[in-house]
């Protein structure tokens, strides 16, 4: 059952990110078939995740998938989730994780999908940690990838982080992704970084898809257009 849940979450997340980009000959299936699949999976997700918490499976990805799917979800579902996030953020004094800054990005994306401003959640600015370049990229390429996706999810300005050793900019995250592109054209979690091991020289479809999503907004930059 756990595998099916994970597949369902991943399916709706992928569809929620790509549905709006498929048109005409680009679509492998008809729009009606795609919409039916989205609705069926969203219904399953809604029935399965009745009380979303702060976390990956059963949390932000479920909220994002449902919000982007167009499925008819009661407003109270999102209101209760936001209240849960607010209580969680207050309980940990605004510090979601001391190492993995994708924790902030994931929550930001989910909040943006339901129309909430991540810059004031229980009095805490959840975008601020993403202003720390070194800490954001520490966990691998998913750090800068999701920082860009999160900040662009609501067109947040780049947050100032006085405590950062290196203040981040959007361009720095873009450049980080580009410089880590592998010879085969894709990306992997640690490929192109100092932490890379022998297996990181081969593209990972998951990370590659994330990288393309993060760079999609920046196609006006020649280096981005060439890389993608």
Language model region names:
Residues 1-11:
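Bacterial N-terminal signal peptides that target proteins for export
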